[in-house]
Regions:
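Nucleotide-sugar donor phosphate/pyrophosphate-binding loop at the beta->alpha transition
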Residues: 38, 128-133, 141-161
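Glycine-rich phosphate-binding loop signature in dinucleotide/nucleotide-binding domains
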Residues: 99-105
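A short, charged, and often flexible helix/loop element on the N-terminal side
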Residues: 56-91
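An aromatic- and histidine-rich active-site surface loop
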Residues: 82-94, 105-128, 134-136
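N-terminal subdomain of nucleotide-sugar transferases
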Residues: 1-61
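A short beta-strand/loop micro-motif in the catalytic core of glycosyltransferases
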Residues: 164-172
């Protein structure tokens, strides 16, 4: 999950935090794989205390292309496909595989927006064979969104891969 404390920009944080809290009531022990706080533009420690104490949180390396790989505030937008946090993908796979070996979860759950989270979930599923649940909070593609035709094609292809390859998809 990209949207996880200490990021301070999205209501998606609450969704992931509540999953961590309430899934335990149904016999699940959530593990959270998220990105390094360095990737977040705005952080706040305010919600860190809402993470249940017994929930394991691992943070993988990742950068925000627009901030960390730009020159004079400009960056090559094609480097940021499918999103600005694509550099999280390799670190997410590495950290996720270590977590899977150590904790042996029953399933993989990824949530978007931030398509890279689903790419990580898909990659982990392919390597482990674990069931993968893809939580699609917002539309990935719609007519005219994203505006850039190449980005639309890339997002559309990823969207189709997610729905085709995941074990279950959740749409809200």
């Amino acid at each position: 999950a990209y949207h996880f404390p200490p990021v301070r920009v999205s209501s998606g944080i609450q969704r992931t935090l509540k999953f961590c809290t309430y899934l335990r009531e149904y016999g699940w022990d959530p593990l959270v794989l998220t990105i390094s706080p360095k990737a977040y533009e705005v952080t706040s420690p305010d919600q860190l205390n809402e993470i249940p104490e017994d929930v394991i949180v691992e943070r993988a390396f990742g950068l925000d292309t627009s901030r960390h790989l730009s020159v004079a505030g400009k960056y090559f937008h094609r480097m940021a496909q499918p999103d600005r946090w694509v550099s999280w993908w390799p670190g997410g796979i590495w950290t996720g595989m270590k977590m899977i070996k150590k904790y042996q979860p029953a399933a993989i759950f990824s949530t978007s927006p931030i398509l890279t989270a689903h790419l990580i979930g898909q990659s982990l599923q392919k390597r482990t064979g674990l069931p993968w649940i893809a939580d699609m909070r917002d539309s990935i593609t719609e007519p005219g969104y994203p505006r850039d035709p190449l980005t639309w094609k890339i997002h559309r292809k990823i969207e189709q891969q997610i729905v085709h390859r995941c074990t279950k998809a959740v749409f809200t």
